[in-house]
A protein has these predicted regions:
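C-terminal motif of bacterial Sec signal peptides marking the signal peptidase cleavage site
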Residues: 14-17
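Positively charged n-region of N-terminal signal peptides that target proteins for export
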Residues: 1-4
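OB-fold nucleic-acid-binding modules
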Residues: 19-98, 102-382
Length: 382
């Protein structure tokens, strides 16, 4: 019966499962219902793995299944009495985390994303709170894996098996009945926030939680210098298929260099709300960008019919701002729905005269290092 319920929930999640940032309610609902704090000594009957051990077992299972090059869509459906535990390191209060939270075993180990599938999680899952996760019936996957010489590892995450497994390996849990049988909160009065770990070297392109203690963890990196580069993927129509070339506009440094535009396409904020998107669009700074990816070109944004369509379908967009330091490149990725999306990056940072110290969750995407801020206070100009 448990398997049937999980399968039905996964099918329902298909309608809403997506890795794109979405609007997050950042207010406060009525006080949550009281719950009985979880007592692991009474309730945990199986084996408790560390997050690193779980990640290593996932990689091993993928190898056994001959799926080491298919990690983008392959997942391990756990059918053993296995558990993980950890303290919550993130909050969705600022809107930069969507339907999930991260946990760490301790300050020295890696972390992992728990794809709960609910919004306003900060009301029920507090930073520093210990949670236990029953893995039996859930799926372990990896988001952001890309095969080939130009790819690399992503980040191991926990959710349900994605029903389609075409774009993603896992989906959000979402169903409260299933959440309550897998995600267990310990005493809310025992909050012990994990301290950020200072790192001076970045993980390599082939690292995930199985091989690097920094992946999924709350870290602090100092001395990051702006690289005059940003990445934004804009859709001509957000209601149409987002994998069609004729619906996509890649604002990348490579494309900017081809047309003599700034490497960041003039995007000097951490992300962009709908109003900020329109401000950038109407300024003309993107007029030389074109619809389509690679060699495809379905017209420049300067064309009235294309700009008009973008104006009518305006939306908030995530942005990755690039910085160099710690022996490599770091993308600071921010949601267009975060409270600080339109916050201007300091001019002295943009012109390279000052660097920043940043704290956030370190993740891997196609072999590149990304950092997700918890709030705007995670950036300090040096």
């Amino acid at each position: 019966m448990k398997r049937i319920i999980i399968a039905l929930a996964a099918a329902a999640a298909l309608l809403t499962s997506c890795e794109e940032f979405q609007p997050v309610f950042t207010g406060k609902y009525d006080n949550p219902e009281a719950y009985a704090p979880f007592d692991p000594e009474e309730s945990v009957t199986g084996t408790v793995l560390t997050i690193k051990e779980l990640s290593q077992r996932f990689i091993s299972k993928a190898s056994e299944a001959g799926a080491s090059e298919q990690l983008k869509t392959w997942c391990w459906e756990v059918s053993e009495d296995l558990w993980i535990k950890g303290r919550i390191t993130t909050s969705d209060r600022s809107g930069n985390f969507y339907k999930s939270f991260y946990i760490q075993d301790d300050a020295n180990g890696p972390g992992i994303e728990i794809k709960v599938g609910r919004t306003s999680l900060h009301n029920d899952y507090k930073v520093g709170q210990m949670v236990y996760i029953s893995l039996d019936g859930l799926a372990v996957g990896e988001y952001g894996y890309k095969s080939g010489s130009y790819g690399g590892q992503g980040s191991v995450q926990l959710g349900l098996k994605d029903p389609q497994q075409i774009k993603y390996s896992t989906s959000y849990i979402e169903d409260q009945y299933i959440i309550d049988r897998h995600v267990f909160r310990c005493d809310v009065n025992d909050l012990q926030p994990i301290a950020p770990r200072k790192i001076s070297a970045l993980p390599g392109k082939n690292d995930c939680q199985a091989t690097s203690d920094a992946v999924g963890a709350l870290v602090t990196i100092s001395g990051l210098k702006y690289a005059d580069e940003a990445f934004t993927l804009v859709y001509l129509n957000g209601n149409e298929a987002n994998d069609k070339s004729e619906n996509r506009i890649f604002l990348t440094k490579d494309n900017a260099d081809k047309v003599g535009a700034p490497g960041n396409w003039g995007v000097t904020t951490w992300a962009m709300s709908k109003s900020k998107f329109l401000e950038y669009l109407n300024s003309g700074i993107w007029d030389k960008a074109h619809v389509g990816g690679g060699a495809d070109n379905f017209g420049e944004l300067s064309k009235p019919e294309i700009k008009s369509q973008l104006q009518g379908n305006a939306n908030a967009y995530s942005v990755s701002q690039y910085f160099t330091g710690a022996g490599g490149t770091v993308q600071i990725r921010t949601s267009g729905y975060s409270k600080f999306a339109d916050l201007q990056i300091a001019p002295e940072v943009l012109n390279g005269s000052k660097t920043i110290t940043v704290t956030g969750i370190l993740t891997m995407y196609q072999g590149g290092v990304q950092l997700i801020l918890r709030d705007q206070d995670d950036v300090v100009v040096e």
